[in-house]
Amino acid sequence: MSNYSQLLQNATWQPSTDMQLPLSISSWLELSTSLTTQLKQAFGEVNVCVLAESWITTLNENERQFFPKQACPCWCREVILKSQDIPLIFARTLIPASLLTQHSELQQLGNRALGEWLFMQSDRIRQKLELTHDKNTALYARRALMSIGAENMMVAELFLTPQIFTRVVK
């Protein structure tokens, strides 16, 4: 497990409405459109580097509280989004087996961004959005509970460089 993954799993999360952030940061963290698309507009080409993909059978308490009524196993996918070899985002996605039975293509994404698939789903709804700011690293992160039909997935994203927040969200 990477340090980034541990940081996301052990973070103190709060509802997005409870955090007072500068507009330059909140506009990225509260983005309701595709983060990948926004990164491409801000940085040009964005590449996905898959760090790990595997089944997990237990969630830590933090993820269990956020992820209602989801039984493991979950497909866990961890990636880094890069532009010009600069790491921009670490993402950890948890997809329950029940969602994969309907959308097995999620296990075949390879170096494609999840957002390319997710934002093509007409029945996609973001149920929850939580944010965190890690004082030790000064990194910001967000996690969302996304519904696809009657099923949920969790997407957590750690913003790896403050350079992101200097770019205007379009």
Curated annotation (Swiss-Prot):
Pathway where this protein functions: Cofactor biosynthesis; ubiquinone biosynthesis
Top-rank EC class of the record's enzyme: lyase
Catalytic activity: chorismate = 4-hydroxybenzoate + pyruvate
Location(s), subcellular: Cytoplasm
Cellular component terms (Gene Ontology): cytosol
GO MF entry, a single one: chorismate lyase activity
Keyword Lyase attributed: yes
A Pfam family matched in the record: Chor_lyase
Binding site for substrate: R77, L114, E157
GO terms for biological process, alphabetical: pyruvate biosynthetic process; ubiquinone biosynthetic process
Superkingdom field: Bacteria
Keywords: Cytoplasm, Lyase, Pyruvate, Ubiquinone biosynthesis
EC number(s) from the headed UniProt entry: 4.1.3.40
Family designation: Belongs to the UbiC family.
HAMAP family: UbiC (MF_01632)
Function: Removes the pyruvyl group from chorismate, with concomitant aromatization of the ring, to provide 4-hydroxybenzoate (4HB) for the ubiquinone pathway.
Protein name per Swiss-Prot or TrEMBL: Probable chorismate pyruvate-lyase
Taxonomic lineage: Bacteria, Pseudomonadati, Pseudomonadota, Gammaproteobacteria, Pasteurellales
